[in-house]
Amino acid sequence: MKNKNTDPMQGHRARKRFGQNFLEDQGIINAIVRSIGPKASDNLVEIGPGKGAITAQLIESCPSMQVVELDRDLIPILLAQFAIYNDFRIHQTDALKFDFGQLATPERPLRVVGNLPYNISTPLIFHLLSFGELIADMHFMLQKEVVLRLAAGPGDKNYGRLSVMTQYVCQVENLFEVPPECFNPRPKVDSAIVRLTPYRTQPFVAAHPDKLAKLVKTAFAQRRKTLRNNLKNLDEELDLEALDIDLTRRAESLSLEEYVNLSNTLWP
């Protein structure tokens, strides 16, 4: 079933406070949809559908998809385009506060898609990771710099807290770049598409994931300082000198496996 409305968004201006940059390049839209490979049986949710450019392609394969949109002015416009699909649902709310768990079950995990507002992308990814057991995969358009951070390994200048904590939960794939001219208005930065696939069986398991998160956050708090200096700020009675690790190393030199082992040594 084809979407007949050619330009339902005429007159709607992108809002800076919502971080809106509308994707308009059909070639890129097609490439994103091919990467996702939507199916009718998918439990698909799109965050920030904007003009509905990607939605229009996805919904033809998955008519029961849902979207989460904060901008209330976009709701009637999206309904005008997609109300012909009886199972299409819109949640007019802030994705940062939304309980994505209510949309999924272990038998029907979510597939999450989104052109995420760059000003909230990192906290939103951390929010979504908390629902990792209920998510099959995630495909996001993000600032290229954020994608590089997500995919970075030890020793890379982009490697940090976001890298470690995302890779603890997910396999990360940097798929392809998207130049500014593909958007209206044009962002001042390059963008990229990333695929995050939560592990069904994690390669490294922390006994206390909350402690691992605290450890990683503390270790990267001041990147130029050594582990010895940063880990003093854990505010717990810990014998750091007894650890089987060189405390003169910096946070960006430790692998995910080393962080998990360190966490399990400190908090068995």
From Swiss-Prot:
Main location, first listed in the record: cytoplasm
Intracellular or extracellular location(s): Cytoplasm
Gene3D superfamilies given in the database record: Ribosomal RNA adenine dimethylase-like, domain 2, Vaccinia Virus protein VP39
Keywords: Cytoplasm, Methyltransferase, RNA-binding, rRNA processing, S-adenosyl-L-methionine, Transferase
Catalyzed reactions: adenosine(1518)/adenosine(1519) in 16S rRNA + 4 S-adenosyl-L-methionine = N(6)-dimethyladenosine(1518)/N(6)-dimethyladenosine(1519) in 16S rRNA + 4 S-adenosyl-L-homocysteine + 4 H(+)
EC number(s) recorded for this UniProt protein: 2.1.1.182
This protein's GO CC annotations: cytosol
InterPro entries for this protein: KsgA/Erm, rRNA_Ade_diMease-like_C, rRNA_Ade_Mease_Trfase_CS, rRNA_Ade_methylase_Trfase_N, rRNA_adenine_dimethylase, SAM-dependent_MTases_sf
The keyword Methyltransferase belongs to this UniProt entry's keyword annotation: yes
Domain of life of the native organism: Bacteria
Any one GO MF annotation of this record: 16S rRNA (adenine(1518)-N(6)/adenine(1519)-N(6))-dimethyltransferase activity
Protein residues bound to S-adenosyl-L-methionine: N21, L23, G48, E69, D94, N115
Keyword tRNA-binding carried by entry: no
Cysteines engaged in disulfide bonds, as pairs: none
Enzyme class at the top of the EC tree: transferase
HAMAP family, sorted: 16SrRNA_methyltr_A
Record PANTHER family: DIMETHYLADENOSINE TRANSFERASE, DIMETHYLADENOSINE TRANSFERASE-RELATED
Free-text function comment from the UniProt entry: Specifically dimethylates two adjacent adenosines (A1518 and A1519) in the loop of a conserved hairpin near the 3'-end of 16S rRNA in the 30S particle. May play a critical role in biogenesis of 30S subunits.
Similarity field: Belongs to the class I-like SAM-binding methyltransferase superfamily. rRNA adenine N(6)-methyltransferase family. RsmA subfamily.
Name assigned to this protein: Ribosomal RNA small subunit methyltransferase A
